[in-house]
From Swiss-Prot:
The keyword Thylakoid applies. The gene is ndhM. This is NAD(P)H-quinone oxidoreductase subunit M. Belongs to the complex I NdhM subunit family. Its main location: membrane. It comes from Gloeothece citriformis (strain PCC 7424).
């Protein structure tokens, strides 16, 4: 049975991609990061998400693969992406199809706000 976890920016499937189709698998997890291209990514930031995913999957080693566990991994990755955004490692893609600022309004520095509103 195909299990999946879908959040705004993370999709995880118990499947592998063959001929551009998802094929159910008991041994492979497929990760789709930011499918709507809401953010601008550099390779280093994207690799951080993949490494975090690997760490989270490893932390569930020996446990049953359930939809609940996949959702926990997906939620943890959402929080990780939010932290990358807050640290300025990624930014919103202003050319995205939809601008919904799902992780908060972008911060724009101006002379009046410079140095204020830091997390």
């Amino acid at each position: 049975m195909l299990l999946k976890s879908t959040t705004r920016h993370i999709r995880i499937y118990t499947a592998e991609i063959q001929n551009n189709e998802l094929v159910e698998s008991d041994n492979v997890l497929t990760l789709d990061v930011d499918p709507d291209n809401e953010f601008l990514w550099d390779e280093d930031s994207l690799q951080k998400v993949y490494r975090k995913f690997d760490d989270l999957v490893e932390s569930y080693s020996g446990e049953d693969l359930t939809e609940y566990n996949l959702r926990r991994i997906g939620s943890d990755l959402e929080l990780f992406i939010r932290s990358l955004l807050q640290q300025g490692e990624i930014s919103y893609n202003l050319d995205s199809r939809v601008l919904n600022y799902s992780m908060g309004l972008p911060r724009v520095e101006s002379p009046e706000t410079e140095g204020k509103y830091r997390l």
